[in-house]
């Protein structure tokens, strides 16, 4: 399976998870559903980050045009980690503490995911990664999933 196809499938899976999580939220939240996206938008992995951004944007645009999730639009908040673990940690902290997201799609670099998942877990934030392949991520958190 090509890397680009994995990103596309990963984006679809995260959107499905957003729908599931949002459907089970109590009490009802008003306003957009904020979803963080950490990707290498610059640096050595920028081409993958750009593809991931385009795929996620198209998927969310389609969902929002069809009424969003339970009538709420999805709003994406992007952070560039440049495939650098320290920048992944900073990005995760910003998404949690400033943007107040409860779901993060971390698209590529295993080292960044390994560094940032513990922060997300401590804060009750779900993380999905479409490319993290490190064996160190197996059973790392009940709030972490990867695929396909």
Language-model features: locations:
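Short, low-complexity disordered leader/linker segments with a strong preference
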Residues: 1-34
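Extracytoplasmic "Venus flytrap"
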Residues: 36-55, 79-86, 108
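Sec/Tat-exported extracytoplasmic proteins
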Residues: 39-45, 59-60, 64-67, 96-99, ...
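Signal peptide-proximal N-terminal region
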Residues: 53-76
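Short beta-strand elements in bilobed, periplasmic/extracellular small-molecule ligand-binding domains
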Residues: 69-82, 140-144
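Extracytoplasmic ligand/sensor domains, especially the bilobed periplasmic-binding protein
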Residues: 100-148
């Amino acid at each position: 399976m090509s890397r680009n196809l994995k990103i596309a499938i990963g984006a679809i899976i995260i959107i499905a998870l957003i729908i599931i999580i949002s459907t089970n939220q109590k009490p009802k939240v008003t306003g957009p559903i904020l979803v963080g996206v950490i990707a290498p938008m610059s640096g050595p992995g920028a081409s993958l980050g750009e593809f991931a951004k385009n795929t996620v944007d198209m998927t969310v645009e389609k969902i929002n045009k069809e009424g969003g999730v339970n009538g709420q639009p999805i709003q994406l908040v992007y952070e560039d980690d440049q495939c650098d673990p320290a920048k992944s940690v900073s990005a995760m902290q910003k998404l949690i503490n400033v943007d107040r997201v409860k779901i993060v799609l971390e698209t590529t670099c295993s080292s960044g995911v390994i560094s940032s998942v513990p922060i997300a877990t401590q804060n009750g934030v779900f993380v999905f990664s479409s490319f993290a392949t490190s064996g160190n991520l197996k059973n790392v958190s009940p709030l972490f999933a990867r695929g396909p």
